[in-house]
């Protein structure tokens, strides 16, 4: 696709690929504009590595009985070096989520240690808990985190290069849009817990 259509790529969702089961490493790596890749199951490490404009969705199987936001669904180093595109993750991601992300947008229901490490751009909306050392070396981009899920402890956030800001209407509009998309793609029940009434529960 990149060879034929170049940097411009194809319109969003031109080619939709659906998978089931357990994917190996690097599912959706370097996926380009126009692709939509959806897997009902789980993925391993390096999910969305170098994402370059595609939309990636990983969701729990329809017949699953467990709570998605309490279980890991993708491995470590998801979205490593992503430059653009979107990812909707119906569960918890492992360590180093969005490391070196420079432009992709991601919604996830929890992350392990070192989340958003060295992130320089893009958006991460985290609907669950974060691990230790969040935002180490993060020099750009935005992470939205719900306070009710996370204690403000010295080992939770690496404050060397980040600051918290008061959210404005634009932020709330972004969050609302991402929640609607996440629900549309994954039917995650956790989205129903976060309405506009929960706006004061956010850290930015």
Question: What are the language-model segments listed below?
Answer:
Residues 194-199:
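Conserved small/polar residues in nucleotide/adenosyl-binding loops
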Residues 54-78:
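Acidic/polar low-complexity surface segments
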Residues 147-167:
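Terminal amphipathic helices with adjacent charged low-complexity linkers/tails
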């Amino acid at each position: 696709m990149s060879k034929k259509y170049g940097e411009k790529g194809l319109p969003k969702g031109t080619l939709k690929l659906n998978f089931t089961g357990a994917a190996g490493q690097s599912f959706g790596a370097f996926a380009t504009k126009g692709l939509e890749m959806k897997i009902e199951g789980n993925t391993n490490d390096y999910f969305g590595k170098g994402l370059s404009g595609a939309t990636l969705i990983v969701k729990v199987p329809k017949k699953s009985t467990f709570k998605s936001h309490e279980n890991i669904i993708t491995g470590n180093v998801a979205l490593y070096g992503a430059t653009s595109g979107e990812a909707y993750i119906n569960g918890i991601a492992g360590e180093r989520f969005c490391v070196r992300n420079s432009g992709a947008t991601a919604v996830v229901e929890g992350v392990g240690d070192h989340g958003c490490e060295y992130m320089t751009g893009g958006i991460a909306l985290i609907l669950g808990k974060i691990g230790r050392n969040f935002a180490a070396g993060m020099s750009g981009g935005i992470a939205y985190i719900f306070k009710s899920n996370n204690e403000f402890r010295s080992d939770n956030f690496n404050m060397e290069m980040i600051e918290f800001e008061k959210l404005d209407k634009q932020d709330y509009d972004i969050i609302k849009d991402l929640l609607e998309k996440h629900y549309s793609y994954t039917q995650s029940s956790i989205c129903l817990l976060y309405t506009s009434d929960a706006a004061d529960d956010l850290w930015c």
